[in-house]
């Protein structure tokens, strides 16, 4: 049996981490549903206590690649934060490709390059902005939202709440 400290570290390694004040965190995720020829987008804005300010899901025609899907949802997440008039945000997703593309100083020539430029433009409108990459296990609520997108038609936004079946994942992360 592992010592308690190691077990605690294992638990910490797979849970959501809150942003540092004064930041709010936008977690996002995207997925392609090949069987239904659609893509799901999920994003959530949370505070330092894990409280939900807003969440969204969208079901769209699938872009060319999974990376394109992740870029579309990153853009939706940052636009949600902008629409909420947030001043300090962390944009966090599990696509290292997108994180690096947003952080890069040069223009992206990839199929999603225009969306990366738009994300950067929106990022400049915040007083404080950070971008963060996280393993999928630490992005489970956004991943659950993305899966829910399979069952919606178009964009759905919730203010200070999430779909009821997402609550168990949210509560597990808060534990």
Q: Which ranges hold each PLM region?
A:
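Primary recognition of RNase H-like, Mg2+-dependent phosphodiesterase/nuclease domains
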Residues: 1-175
């Amino acid at each position: 049996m592992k010592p308690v400290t190691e077990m605690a570290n294992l638990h910490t390694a797979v849970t959501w981490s809150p942003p540092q004040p004064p930041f709010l965190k936008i977690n996002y995720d995207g997925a392609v549903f090949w069987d239904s020829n659609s893509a799901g987008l999920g994003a959530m804005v949370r505070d330092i206590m894990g409280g939900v300010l807003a969440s969204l899901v969208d079901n769209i025609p699938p872009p060319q690649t999974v990376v394109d899907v992740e870029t579309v949802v990153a853009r939706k997440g940052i636009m949600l934060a902008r629409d909420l008039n947030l001043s300090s945000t962390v944009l966090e997703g599990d696509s290292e490709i997108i994180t690096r593309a947003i952080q890069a100083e040069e223009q992206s020539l990839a199929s999603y390059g225009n969306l990366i430029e738009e994300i950067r433009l929106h990022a400049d409108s915040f007083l404080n902005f950070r971008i963060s990459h996280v393993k999928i296990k630490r992005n489970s609520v956004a991943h659950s939202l993305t899966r829910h997108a399979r069952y919606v038609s178009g964009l759905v936004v919730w203010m200070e709440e999430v779909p009821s079946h997402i609550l168990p994942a949210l509560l597990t992360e808060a534990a």
